[in-house]
Amino acid sequence: MNASRQGAVGPTIAVAAGKGGTGKTLLATSLAVALAENLTSGPARRGVSTVQLLDCDVEEPNADLLLQPRFISRRPVSIMVPQVSKTLCTLCGLCAQKCQFSAIAVIREVVVTFPELCCGCGVCAHVCPERAISEVQRPVGVVDLGRTEEGIEFVQGRMNVGEQRAGPVTRATKRFIEPQAISILDAPPGTACPMQETVEESDYCLLVTEPTPFGLSDLNAAVETCRSLHVPCGVIVNRDRPQEGYQPLDEYCRAEGLPVLLRIPETREVAEAYSRGRTLARAFPEWAQPLREMYGQIKKSIPSA
């Protein structure tokens, strides 16, 4: 288990994909439903109190469309941005030199700040020799908290329109991870910073892919990202076509030592259910057991889980 989560009972499982549209959110929500139903109707898992679904795709969260939670509260997310005192500032330019994000600049005899570029690190205020820079709060998004009919604790981060940095809202969303819960993180698509911010410090990452050349290419990028973060990962093949197959995908997984934990067939029934906003576990009860068995495999591969 990740060192930062020592003492936690339930694992944190991220669900990611190299690109959008692979079925990542369908898998994350279906797994959450299957596990939550097992907690309430099946034998209770030792020490685990509940299942959480955290939608960390903060630019465009949509897991709520499938789970239909009842939202209970909303928490604002803000970062600290610089405010420069014109009377104290000597225009030395040290703040602009140290800012890695070009969020502050000295232009002629004026200090200009660009709040939308600021990450809130505070280095400008720290290095100012005249103490001319103070910090003020700037709203960047919200975190919505709710609960589904199965008892899933639902956490959804959402950036304000026009914001450019997902990191602050993603981190705020992840602060609601509970150590006594099975926490499933729906990551944003791709392998850029927002995905890495979500997957980082997870106990395991499920990578959803498709049996196509593009799917394999994106999977390779996602695997490399997980390994750079030291997060173990397994593969879910969505839209699987057993009759046709795609040998390079299976060969890649074998060569890289990646377990293929689940295959979701390409059927009209699954596509129709998804288009109506239904998870696998709700639309097809027979899918609940394979999802739970997959979770059991994941648990076995997490040290001390």
Functional labels for PLM-detected ranges:
Residues 68-86:
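N-terminal glycine-rich dinucleotide-binding loop that anchors FAD/FMN and/or NAD(P) in oxidoreductases
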Residues 2-6, 225-305:
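C-terminal lobe/tail of nucleotide-utilizing enzymes
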Residues 83-102, 112-132:
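Cysteine-centered iron-sulfur cluster-binding motifs in ferredoxin-type domains/subunits
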Residues 194-213, 219:
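Inter-motif core of Ras-like GTPase G domains
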Residues 3-39:
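Walker A (P-loop) phosphate-binding motif
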Residues 56-57, 156-161, 165, 170-195:
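Switch II (G3) loop of P-loop NTPases
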Residues 40-42, 46-64, 137-143:
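Short beta-strand-centered segment that lines the nucleotide-binding/catalytic pocket of NTP-utilizing
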Residues 37, 179, 203-206, 227-234:
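Short, surface-exposed connector motifs at secondary-structure boundaries
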